[in-house]
Amino acid sequence: MKFSEQWLRQWVNPPCDTAELAHLLTMAGLEVEAIEPVAGEFANVVVGQVQSIEPHPDADKLRVCQVSVGQQESLQIVCGAPNVTEGMKVPVALVGARLPGGLKIKKTKLRGVASSGMLCSASELGLAESSEGLMALPVDALVGEDLRGFLQLDDDSIELGLTPNRGDCLCIAGIAREVGVLTRCEVQVPIVDQVAIDSQRSLPITIKAAADCPRYVGRVIEGVDLAVDTPLWMQEALRRSGLRSLGPAVDVTNYVLLELGQPMHAFDLGKLQGG
């Protein structure tokens, strides 16, 4: 079981640091096998917004971007990412920034055009093993804000080696209950607003293996837009738990499993036949 320490502390926040928390869990039989930071070491990276894009005069695959980073003047940054668009918000490594692997960003010229900074992908920041193009940030990200603060990257992923008798701790809720008992801290169960489902459609279900599955519950949900991106905060919670984003429907079910321990699966209603 791998999880974000910040996620756990949303449920229960004992007055101890990461090392003390890991010791408490291990002594309680929930052996901590690994603790690792959720992102690579980097500094001086902020939220930027691409204001304009022009073709590079001497390189077909490069483009010259004017980028706002919350200062009086925008920065000119040469970029080769295929997905850069006007208006998008992206991580910007300022001149003097240090990225994972020891790369230091300097003011330079690319094919004769000055470039003052670097637009970053998720992999260049240690947030993904690989990535295609720039990391797109949410539209509500504040231009100029430090990226580590915006993404709350001062966090650790904790991995537990659970024994078969502790299946109750295969989720944040179960681990939080255990930590609450160990530290005598109150567990704060998140308040979730009830969502009204208006669909009147249903699908008959037949349980053919009642001994193994005595009860099955499903619900038809219509009007789901699978073209939208999963919210970045949910993508980050999944990533810090060892899962990658696979689209909003799968991500929501995986998130519920990790937080509450309730297995779920989303089916395409149009492809279901029978019951």
At which residue positions do the language-model features occur?
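Phosphate-backbone binding interfaces of nucleic-acid-interacting proteins
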Residues: 1-199
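Glycine/proline-enriched, intrinsically flexible loops and inter-domain linkers
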Residues: 5, 23, 28, 63, ...
